[in-house]
């Protein structure tokens, strides 16, 4: 089943719904990123104000809720979603999201979607869309969940995953990471559906957080001394960001970079290394803080595009950039402080990437865990005795966090430091340690993990 070829199109979707639909198609057909495609479409077409806000809600909400929407669509259509034409399926997702999770009038949600189906296809396909959406509109989300979700008593994790539109394996990974606090699972999953504030980082020695907050009409952050919150807006248009006085960076990432500089190291000679530097936000913070103690940062990044971003974000700072694989750098060992912000599944930042929860697969974990262990081993080899490695990920998956650290402790002459004091007293109540796991529902940050290791010999 493919879209038909026809004459001039009539009665297209309104601009907001059209932008949302085209973004959904880009995500489905080209593996594009909604948070990159949609803003460009809105700017190109001059869509602003309420229309832009509506398009954003439809796009990001539909991307996040895809699994739940597909289950409802499949039940209403009495066929597998995979058997439905991909273009029709995206239209159905857009319509179903409006019916179940917005206050849009049901008639408007159905009629606009059916009209677009008639433009994209023919009357028969439009009739199919009409029938499915009218069936869905006959019940609210709670009713559909009650019918389709796993039983909450027999499968609480599966039930929570369905209700909050996450793949079950991700909900299980969060539950495993929470451990004794598994009762917070629903709060973790719900936080992924909340639109996060934009976090900025004031460049140390250039601008204070207070000065930045006044310049951009934001709010000084709760934890990082560099953080400023913006409720919404395009940070790339802000003068301090354009001029290099501030960076767009989650507050948790700021705390990770700061933690490395606070780790106790006797006889610090100022040789610092960022082994996984792209896109350069943490490198810039390290270099800015390093200026206060005459430290120099070596940044390693193999990706050409990400290396270019490192160069852009660290211009004017004492940073040496090497465009090589962090596992094979040919660098002379002896670094005092090494940051390994390892490539990961990004499960801790799903709230910032609407489609990511459905794009990631369980098989990704094993490949990334292998890479993470290799990078951590390389970092330890480059660290001098008495020096510190800070290992971090923006994923709470145990294979990517405590699993990687446990592997390093078994195979290398390192000792795990209590990482909590490097975050306290800024953040209290970090648990039993020795490592730190931040959570969006507790701290308002991405779910960053951090572990500090001291090399012994």
UniProtKB/Swiss-Prot annotation:
<comment type="function">
    <text>May act as RNA methyltransferase.</text>
</comment>
<keyword id="KW-0489">Methyltransferase</keyword>
<dbReference type="GO" id="GO:0003723">
    <property type="term" value="F:RNA binding"/>
</dbReference>
<dbReference type="GO" id="GO:0006355">
    <property type="term" value="P:regulation of DNA-templated transcription"/>
</dbReference>
<feature type="binding site">
    <location>
        <position position="301"/>
    </location>
    <ligand>
        <name>S-adenosyl-L-methionine</name>
    </ligand>
</feature>
<dbReference type="Pfam" id="PF01189">
    <property type="entry name" value="Methyltr_RsmB-F"/>
</dbReference>
<feature type="binding site">
    <location>
        <begin position="276"/>
        <end position="282"/>
    </location>
    <ligand>
        <name>S-adenosyl-L-methionine</name>
    </ligand>
</feature>
<keyword id="KW-0694">RNA-binding</keyword>
<dbReference type="InterPro" id="IPR006027">
    <property type="entry name" value="NusB_RsmB_TIM44"/>
</dbReference>
<dbReference type="InterPro" id="IPR001678">
    <property type="entry name" value="MeTrfase_RsmB-F_NOP2_dom"/>
</dbReference>
<dbReference type="InterPro" id="IPR035926">
    <property type="entry name" value="NusB-like_sf"/>
</dbReference>
<dbReference type="GO" id="GO:0008173">
    <property type="term" value="F:RNA methyltransferase activity"/>
</dbReference>
<dbReference type="InterPro" id="IPR018314">
    <property type="entry name" value="RsmB/NOL1/NOP2-like_CS"/>
</dbReference>
<dbReference type="InterPro" id="IPR023267">
    <property type="entry name" value="RCMT"/>
</dbReference>
<feature type="binding site">
    <location>
        <position position="325"/>
    </location>
    <ligand>
        <name>S-adenosyl-L-methionine</name>
    </ligand>
</feature>
<dbReference type="GO" id="GO:0001510">
    <property type="term" value="P:RNA methylation"/>
</dbReference>
<dbReference type="InterPro" id="IPR029063">
    <property type="entry name" value="SAM-dependent_MTases_sf"/>
</dbReference>
<comment type="similarity">
    <text>Belongs to the class I-like SAM-binding methyltransferase superfamily. RsmB/NOP family.</text>
</comment>
<keyword id="KW-0808">Transferase</keyword>
<protein>
    <recommendedName>
        <fullName>Putative methyltransferase Rv1407</fullName>
        <ecNumber>2.1.1.-</ecNumber>
    </recommendedName>
</protein>
<dbReference type="GO" id="GO:0009274">
    <property type="term" value="C:peptidoglycan-based cell wall"/>
</dbReference>
<dbReference type="InterPro" id="IPR049560">
    <property type="entry name" value="MeTrfase_RsmB-F_NOP2_cat"/>
</dbReference>
<dbReference type="Pfam" id="PF01029">
    <property type="entry name" value="NusB"/>
</dbReference>
<dbReference type="InterPro" id="IPR048019">
    <property type="entry name" value="RsmB-like_N"/>
</dbReference>
<keyword id="KW-0949">S-adenosyl-L-methionine</keyword>
<feature type="active site" description="Nucleophile">
    <location>
        <position position="394"/>
    </location>
</feature>
<feature type="binding site">
    <location>
        <position position="341"/>
    </location>
    <ligand>
        <name>S-adenosyl-L-methionine</name>
    </ligand>
</feature>
């Amino acid at each position: 089943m493919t879209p038909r070829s026809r004459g001039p199109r009539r009665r297209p979707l309104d601009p907001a719904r059209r932008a949302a639909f085209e973004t959904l198609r880009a995500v489905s057909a080209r593996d594009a990123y909604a948070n990159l495609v949609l803003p460009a479409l809105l700017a190109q077409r001059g869509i602003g104000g309420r229309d832009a806000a509506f398009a954003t809600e439809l796009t990001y909400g539909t991307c996040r809720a895809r699994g739940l929407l597909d289950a409802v669509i499949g039940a209403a259509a009495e066929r597998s979603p995979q058997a439905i034409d991909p273009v029709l399926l995206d239209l159905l997702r857009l319509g179903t999201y409006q019916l179940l999770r917005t206050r849009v009038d049901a008639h408007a949600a159905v009629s606009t979607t059916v009209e677009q189906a008639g433009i994209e296809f023919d009357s028969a396909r439009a009739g199919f869309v009409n029938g499915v959406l009218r069936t869905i509109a006959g019940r609210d989300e709670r009713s559909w969940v009650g019918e389709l979700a796993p039983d909450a008593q027999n499968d609480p994790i599966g039930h929570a995953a369905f209700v909050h539109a996450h793949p079950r394996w991700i909900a299980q990974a969060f539950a495993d990471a929470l451990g004794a606090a598994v009762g917070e699972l629903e709060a973790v999953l719900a936080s992924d559906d909340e639109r996060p504030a934009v976090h900025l980082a004031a460049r140390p020695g250039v601008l204070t957080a207070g000065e930045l907050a006044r310049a951009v009409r934001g709010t000084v952050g709760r934890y990082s001394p560099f953080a400023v919150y913006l409720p919404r807006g395009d940070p790339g248009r802000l003068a301090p960001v354009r001029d290099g006085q501030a960076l767009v960076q989650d507050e948790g990432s700021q705390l990770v970079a700061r933690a490395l500089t606070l780790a106790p190291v006797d006889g610090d000679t100022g040789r610092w290394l960022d082994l996984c530097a792209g896109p350069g936000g943490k490198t810039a913070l390290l270099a800015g803080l390093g200026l206060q103690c005459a430290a120099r940062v070596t940044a390693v990044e193999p990706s050409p595009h990400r290396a270019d971003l490192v160069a852009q974000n660290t211009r004017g700072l004492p940073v040496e950039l090497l465009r090589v694989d962090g596992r094979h750098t040919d660098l002379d060992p002896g670094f005092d402080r090494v940051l390994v912000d390892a490539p990961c599944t990004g499960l801790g930042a799903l709230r910032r990437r609407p489609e990511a929860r459905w794009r990631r697969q369980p098989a990704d974990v094993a490949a990334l865990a292998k890479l993470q262990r290799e990078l951590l081993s390389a970092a330890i080899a480059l660290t001098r005795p008495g020096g510190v490695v800070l290992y971090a990920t923006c994923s709470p998956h145990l294979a990517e966090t405590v699993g990687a650290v446990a592997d390093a402790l078994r195979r290398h002459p390192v000792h795990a430091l209590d990482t909590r004091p490097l975050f306290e007293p800024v953040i209290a109540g970090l648990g039993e340690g020795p490592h730190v796991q931040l959570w969006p529902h507790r701290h308002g940050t991405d779910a960053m993990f951090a572990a500090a290791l001291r090399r012994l010999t």
